[in-house]
Amino acid sequence: MPHVRVKENEPFEVALRRFKRTCEKAGVLTEVRRREFYEKPTEIRKRKAAAAVKRQAKRVSKEVARRERLY
């Protein structure tokens, strides 16, 4: 859990904004949303496999675009 020390004479809104930013960088909200409901192990594997396919397709499309620019 990220924590932020409030500096002297620092407005509450500024400290809250810094805390929100650190939570965003740490991925707290995405983790909470992901763990909100139970996910079956098969669903986890399917999600990871789909993400891997998506990454591979993105990598291939970037490679093809790079090759086209070279000629």
UniProtKB/Swiss-Prot annotation:
Q: Which residues form the signal peptide?
A: none
PROSITE patterns, alphabetized = RIBOSOMAL_S21 (PS01181)
Any matching Pfam family: Ribosomal_S21
What's an example GO cellular component term for this entry? ribosome
Q: Which domain of life is it from?
A: Bacteria
Entry GO MF terms? structural constituent of ribosome
* Keywords for this protein: Ribonucleoprotein, Ribosomal protein
InterPro entries referenced in this protein's UniProt entry, alphabetically? Ribosomal_bS21, Ribosomal_bS21_CS, Ribosomal_bS21_sf
Question: Per its UniProt record, what Gene3D superfamilies does this chain match?
Answer: Ribosomal protein S8
Mind listing the GO biological process terms from this record?
translation
Q: Which PANTHER family match?
A: MITOCHONDRIAL 28S RIBOSOMAL PROTEIN S21 (PTHR21109), SMALL RIBOSOMAL SUBUNIT PROTEIN BS21 (PTHR21109:SF22)
What HAMAP family would the database entry show? Ribosomal_bS21
Xref: NCBIfam families: S21p
**So what family is this one in?**
Belongs to the bacterial ribosomal protein bS21 family.
- According to UniProt, the name of this protein is Small ribosomal subunit protein bS21
Q: Which species is the source of this protein?
A: Thioalkalivibrio sulfidiphilus (strain HL-EbGR7)
Could you read off the lineage of the organism from its UniProt record? Bacteria, Pseudomonadati, Pseudomonadota, Gammaproteobacteria, Chromatiales
